[in-house]
Curated annotation (Swiss-Prot):
One of its GO terms (molecular function) is catalytic activity. Belongs to the CobB/CobQ family. CobQ subfamily. Residues 251-448 form the GATase cobBQ-type domain. PANTHER family: COBYRIC ACID SYNTHASE, DETHIOBIOTIN SYNTHETASE. The active site is at C332, H440. Keywords: Cobalamin biosynthesis, Glutamine amidotransferase. This is Cobyric acid synthase. InterPro entries: Class_I_gatase-like, CobQ/CobB/MinD/ParA_Nub-bd_dom, CobQ_GATase1, CobQ_N, CobQ_synth, GATase_3, P-loop_NTPase. Homodimer. Disulfide bonds: none annotated. Catalyzes amidations at positions B, D, E, and G on adenosylcobyrinic A,C-diamide. NH(2) groups are provided by glutamine, and one molecule of ATP is hydrogenolyzed for each amidation.
Length: 506
C-alpha cells in the first residue's frame, strides 16, 4: 500500500518545490522508496531523462533528493511558455502542440485519465509519493478543470499540507484566505500548514499560530526558517526577485543576460557554486561592466529574445564588451543568437534573420525537437581561456529545435557520442572570444568548469585555483542540510501519521 502526501501553496514561489525535495530526502534517509510527482508543471527550466524524455527540472532535482533516476512519469505534463499567451505542451516528455491559455483550459479534462494512469503506475513502484501542486489551490476560476492542485489530490486520494511564505508578508491572511476559498471537501483534505521562509524569533509567531489554528481548525506543523541552501529554482520567479544578485566579491565575475524567455538557467547553478565565481544576471546595458565572461543562455523564443537584445540595447552592449576582449559564450538559443544567420521557416514565419555575428554559423529551425542526454569530449585544441579544457570529457543534455552549421573561421567545440556515432557540436572562433554549444548542463562537469574558470583567472593574471570541489557532492550536502533543518523545525512524525491515516490502495 502506497502512502502519499501533497504540498500545495498559498501562491507561487512559496517554497513547495524545495520542501517537497526535503520530504523526498527525509523519506529516502528513512529507508523508503520515494518518488516525486507533479501532474502539470509550467516552467522554462526542463531537463532530459536517460531515455530522452523532457520533464521539469523541479521533479528532476526532487528525484535526485530521493536517490532515484528521474522518470518522465513524475511530470507527465510540462507547459513551456513561448509568449505571454502561448505555451508549448509537452506530454510524457514529447512535444504535443502549442496552445493558448483558453484552448488548454478546454483541453485539460482529456488529460485526467492519462494523468491518473501515470500516477498509479508510478505509485505501484514506490512506498511514498510526494506530490506537488502549482501556484495556489484557491484559483477559483480554474477549479472546475483543475488537474494539478485539489483536482490531483482528489485523483490520488491523498492528504494536503499547505505551504505559506511569511517572507512576503501577510502570511496569516494568505492561509486563512486560501482555506476560506476552498470547498468543504477540499478543506477537509488539508491536514496541516507549514509557514516557510521565516526570519527572526519564532516566539513572535506563537500567538498568531494559535489564532490561525483556532480560526481554521488546521494545525501548523512547523515554521521553517529562511535557509541558506543552494538548491534549484523551478521557474523565473527567483530571477525576478533577484535571488541571484551575486553581490559577494569574487575573483571572477560572469554576466548572464537575463532574456525575457530565458530557459534552463539551472545551467549556471554549478558555476555559481564555484568558490571564486560571482554570477550576475544582467537586464540593462549599463550593467554590463567589469565582467570576465558574458553568457547568452537558452531561450524558449530565440527570435523574440534576439529582437529584445537589439531593442533594449543589450546587443550593442554585448558586442562592445566583446570588442574590449571579453569572451562571449552562448548556450542553445544563446548559441543560435551568436551566429550570422537564423532561418525560421517553422515557428515565427519571420524567415531569415541576422544574428549577432560573433560566430560564422547558420542556424535553421526544424519541426522536431532534439531531446537527449549525451557524453561528449571537448576538442583536442581550444584557444585562449578554453585551452585548459581541451580534450576533457563532459556530460549534458540537448533540448533544441534546429541545426547549426559552421562556416569558415569557426572550429568545432566538442564531439558528442550519440547512438554509437560521433557528432560535432558547438563552435569556437580562432581567438576563443566567441564560443557556443547546444549542450545544457555543461558546467555540471567539474573538471571542465574548473578549467575554464582558471582560464578566465589566467586572463586576469591570477594563479589557477586548485580545488577538489565536486558539484554532485555539493548537491547531496544541500539535500542533507535541507532534510536536517526540516526535521528540526517541522513535525515530521505528524506528517507520517497524516500519510498513514490516509493510506490508499493503488
Amino acid at each position: 500500500m502506497t502512502q502519499a502526501v501533497m504540498l500545495q501553496g498559498t501562491a507561487s514561489d512559496v517554497g513547495k518545490s524545495v520542501l517537497a525535495a526535503g520530504l523526498c530526502r527525509i523519506f529516502y534517509q528513512d529507508g523508503l522508496r520515494t518518488a516525486p510527482f507533479k501532474s502539470q508543471n509550467m516552467a522554462l527550466n526542463s531537463g532530459i531523462t536517460p531515455d530522452g524524455k523532457e520533464m521539469g527540472r523541479a521533479q528532476i532535482f526532487q528525484a535526485e533528493a530521493a536517490g532515484i533516476t528521474p522518470d518522465v512519469r513524475m511530470n507527465p505534463v510540462l507547459l513551456k511558455p513561448t509568449s505571454d499567451r502561448q505555451a508549448q505542451v509537452v506530454l510524457m516528455g514529447k512535444v504535443a502542440t502549442n496552445m493558448d491559455a483558453v484552448s488548454y483550459h478546454d483541453y485539460k479534462p482529456r488529460l485526467r485519465e492519462q494523468i491518473l494512469a501515470v500516477y498509479n503506475s508510478l505509485a505501484q513502484e514506490y512506498d511514498v509519493i510526494v506530490l506537488e501542486g502549482a501556484g495556489s489551490p484557491a484559483e477559483i476560476n480554474l477549479r472546475d478543470r483543475d488537474i494539478v492542485n485539489m483536482g490531483m489530490a482528489e485523483m490520488a486520494q491523498c492528504p494536503v499540507i499547505l505551504v505559506a511564505d511569511i517572507d512576503r508578508g501577510g502570511v496569516f491572511a494568505a492561509i486563512y484566505g486560501t482555506l476560506a476559498l476552498l470547498h468543504k471537501q477540499e478543506r477537509d483534505r488539508v491536514k496541516g500548514v507549514i509557514i516557510n521562509k521565516f526570519r527572526g524569533d519564532v516566539a513572535l509567531l506563537y500567538s498568531g499560530i494559535e489564532q490561525i489554528e483556532s480560526l481554521t481548525g488546521v494545525p501548523v506543523l512547523g515554521v521553517m526558517p529562511w535557509l541558506d541552501v543552494d538548491l534549484e529554482d523551478e521557474d523565473g520567479v527567483a530571477l525576478q526577485n533577484d535571488k541571484y544578485r551575486g553581490n559577494a566579491p569574487r575573483d571572477i565575475t560572469i554576466a548572464i543576460v537575463q532574456l525575457p524567455h530565458i530557459s534552463n538557467f539551472t545551467d549556471f547553478n554549478a558555476l555559481a557554486a564555484q568558490p571564486d565565481v560571482r554570477i550576475r544576471y544582467i537586464r540593462r546595458p549599463e550593467a554590463l561592466t567589469d565582467v570576465d565572461l558574458v553568457i547568452l543562455p537558452g531561450s524558449k523564443n530565440t527570435l523574440s529574445d534576439l529582437a529584445w537584445l537589439r531593442e533594449s540595447g543589450m546587443a550593442d552592449a554585448v558586442l562592445q564588451t566583446h570588442r574590449q576582449g571579453v569572451p562571449v559564450m552562448g548556450i542553445c538559443g544563446g548559441y543560435q543568437m551568436l551566429g550570422d544567420t537564423i532561418v525560421d521557416e517553422v515557428e515565427s514565419g519571420l524567415g531569415t534573420q541576422p544574428g549577432l555575428g560573433l560566430l560564422n554559423t547558420i542556424t535553421r529551425f526544424a519541426q522536431d525537437k532534439t531531446t537527449t542526454q549525451v557524453n561528449a569530449t571537448m576538442s583536442g585544441e581550444l584557444p585562449g581561456w578554453l585551452a585548459a579544457a581541451a580534450g576533457l570529457p563532459v556530460r549534458g543534455y540537448e533540448i533544441h529545435m534546429g541545426e547549426t552549421v559552421l562556416q569558415e573561421g569557426c572550429c568545432t567545440a566538442m564531439t558528442l557520442q550519440k547512438n554509437g556515432c560521433s557528432v560535432a557540436d558547438g563552435a569556437v572562433t580562432a581567438d576563443g572570444l566567441a564560443f557556443g554549444t547546444y549542450l545544457h548542463g555543461l558546467f555540471d562537469s567539474d573538471a571542465f568548469t574548473r578549467a575554464v574558470v582558471n582560464g578566465l583567472r589566467a586572463r586576469k593574471g591570477l594563479a589557477p585555483w586548485e580545488t577538489t570541489f565536486c558539484y554532485a557532492d555539493h548537491k547531496a550536502r544541500q539535500f542533507d542540510l535541507l532534510a536536517e533543518a526540516m526535521r528540526q523545525h517541522i513535525d515530521i512524525d505528524k506528517i507520517y501519521t497524516i500519510m498513514q491515516q490516509h493510506q490508499e490502495p493503488v
